[in-house]
Amino acid sequence: MSSTKNKGSDAEQQATIFLQQQQLTLLEKNYRCRFGEIDLIMQDGDTVVFVEVRMRVNQLFGGAAASITPAKQLKLTRAARHYLARCDEDFPCRFDAILISGNREIEWIQNAFDEG
């Protein structure tokens, strides 16, 4: 496994632990479909939360938040629709971002974007 994949895996694990400490429940990790991949799918009460995890060592090029481009948001929303279509019920959902800095500080942005 490459160093980048290891860092990504570590960041996702850190994000999972953080969100579980906030009382969210892990439903799925690294959900893949033809539309893309969702890092974490969590449940917060009756809401399904699709989480994009980003880690940036430095703030060049705008930091972690800037890396969630409109194109990436579109892929995430399409993958989320695919996931929800498999469910028997119509759950409310939201898109969150977990941003992890080089010093491992976590920023949790709830409702980071909408389905637009």
Curated annotation (Swiss-Prot):
InterPro entries: Restrct_endonuc-II-like (IPR011335), tRNA_endonuc-like_dom_sf (IPR011856), UPF0102_YraN-like (IPR003509). Pfam families: UPF0102. SUPFAM superfamilies: Restriction endonuclease-like (SSF52980). One of its GO terms (molecular function) is nucleic acid binding. Disulfide bonds: none annotated. Gene3D superfamilies: 3.40.1350.10. NCBIfam families: PRK12497.1-3 (NF009150), YraN family protein (TIGR00252). Belongs to the UPF0102 family. This is UPF0102 protein Neut_1662.
